[in-house]
Amino acid sequence: MEAGQIFLYLIIALIGFYIIRKVLVYRSVKHYSPVNASLKLKKERNVVLLDVRTDMERKQDSIKGSYHIPLMDISSSENELKKFKDAEIICYCRTGNRSMNAASKLKKMGFNAANLSRGIIGWKAAGLR
C-alpha cells in the first residue's frame, strides 16, 4: 500500500469517527421544538431556559425569562448552575448547534439538560416571544 492510500484511509477513518461522535452526542441529548419548549415552560415549574450565546448576541435579543451563561463558560459555572440541579435546563443559542454542545456538557456535569431545536431563530419563526 502506498503512503497516499494510507493517508486517504486515515482521513476517511477520522471523518467517520467525527460523524459517529456527532451522531452519538445528538442522540444523547433531548431536543424540544420551540412550540413544545414554550408549552413545557408554561406548564412546568422545574424548567429553565439557558441562553448559551455570547454576551454580544444576548444584548441584541433574548428569550424573555431566560438565564445567560455563554457556552465557553459552562464548565466553569457549576456553582452558579447548582440552583438548577433539580430542574430541566433547556439550552438555546442562535440555531441549536452550540446549545446542543452545552446540553451535552451539562449532562456530563450531572444536570438534566436538553436542547432547543433551531435555537432563537426557530423560536422567533414560531411566533414566540
Model-found features: residue ranges?
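Rhodanese-like catalytic fold shared by cysteine-dependent sulfurtransferases
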Residues: 1-36, 40-43, 47, 55-88, ...
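Short, surface-exposed ligand- or partner-binding patches at beta-edge/loop junctions that are enriched
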Residues: 92
